[in-house]
A protein has these predicted regions:
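Short, hydrophobic transmembrane alpha-helix segments
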Residues: 2-5, 24-33
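Alpha-helical transmembrane segments of polytopic membrane proteins
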Residues: 6-17, 67-81, 124-137, 181-195, ...
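Residue-level recognition of alpha-helical structural elements
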Residues: 35-39, 67, 150-152
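C-terminal transmembrane-bundle signature of multipass membrane proteins
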Residues: 20-23, 141-142, 162-263
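Internal transmembrane alpha-helix with an interfacial aromatic "cap," most often the third helix
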Residues: 19-29, 74-123, 130-155, 195-206, ...
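Membrane-interface interhelical loops and short amphipathic "cap" helices
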Residues: 1, 59-67, 177-179
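Transmembrane alpha-helix boundary signature
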Residues: 53-63, 87-95
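Hydrophobic alpha-helical transmembrane segments of multi-pass membrane proteins
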Residues: 10-24, 36-61, 72-82, 101-117, ...
Length: 263
């Protein structure tokens, strides 16, 4: 992956947000004593900070060159696994309780990994990262199902949207010229629509002062989806999805804080 000036700037912003949230987490009363979940989130933030530090420094020193596999790849995978552990602690149901939804999520991640490899030709990073990311996405599916935050129609619409998104991305690879640009724009708009719907649901839940379980489920799902979006993006759309990702990091913090404080 290569870094542009705008991407480095967005990385600096996310780094600052992660540092801010980490400091606030460390100041929470009872952190590490009353809730193991806060600790998992804290560790995930630490890994995110190391990942962003590497990304920003490398981007500044080697602008426009492809980043080789390095320690930051391990940090990125650790972020996904630790966030998944956060959810699994609150929502301990096994994957087979929701086989259809989990299987669909696994297929989406598998298809995404294939596309990542086509774009980057980085087999090892993409496969290892995909395994960690897939575990997080499946954990989000279980959390959403447990809290019943989506109707049956919403699940079907989400499944259809994911199928269309993969089809559009394949179309981008197999076509050229205006047709390829059309597929690309449609894919970006579809990803943004998904983010908008999750964000709207999250804002609604926060306004209603819902319980921490629902807030964890929706904010972690938003982070996961927006991560998938910027993995499939470039240029200004990459920055857009990255900013949305930062918003969900802050929402995750509010949800975890509510859980730690027992609010």
């Amino acid at each position: 992956m290569t870094a542009s000036t705008a991407e480095v700037i967005s990385g600096v912003i996310q780094l600052a947000i992660a540092l801010f949230v980490t400091i606030r987490m460390l100041r929470l009363p009872g952190i590490g004593r009353h809730s193991a979940n806060g600790v998992f989130y804290l560790f995930a933030l630490a890994c995110l900070i190391f990942d962003e530090c590497y990304w920003v420094i490398y981007g500044l020193l080697q602008m426009k060159t492809r980043m080789p596999i390095a320690a930051n790849e391990l940090c990125e995978g650790a972020v996904f696994l630790l966030l998944a552990k956060e959810l699994k602690t609150v929502f301990p149901k096994k994957f087979f309780f929701y086989k259809r939804e989990v299987f669909a999520a696994m297929l989406f991640v598998a298809a995404s990994v294939v596309l990542w490899i086509v774009w980057s030709e980085e087999w090892l990073q993409d496969i290892l990262g995909g395994l960690c990311f897939g575990y997080l996405m499946c954990s989000c599916v279980i959390a959403l199902k447990e809290e019943q935050l989506l109707t049956r129609m919403a699940w079907r619409s989400m499944l259809a949207g994911c199928v269309v998104l993969i089809a559009l991305q394949v179309g981008v690879q197999l076509s050229s010229g205006q047709i390829s640009h059309g597929f690309d724009l449609a894919a970006y708009l579809l990803m943004a629509a998904g983010e908008a719907l999750i964000l709207a649901k999250a804002v609604s839940l926060f306004r209603k002062r819902s319980g921490y379980r629902s807030l964890l489920a929706i904010s972690f799902s938003g982070f996961t989806w927006s991560t998938s979006c910027f993995y499939m993006s470039s240029g200004s759309w990459y920055i857009f999805h990255y900013v949305i990702n930062i918003v969900f990091i802050l929402m995750m913090w509010e949800a975890v804080k509510k859980e730690v404080l027992g609010a």
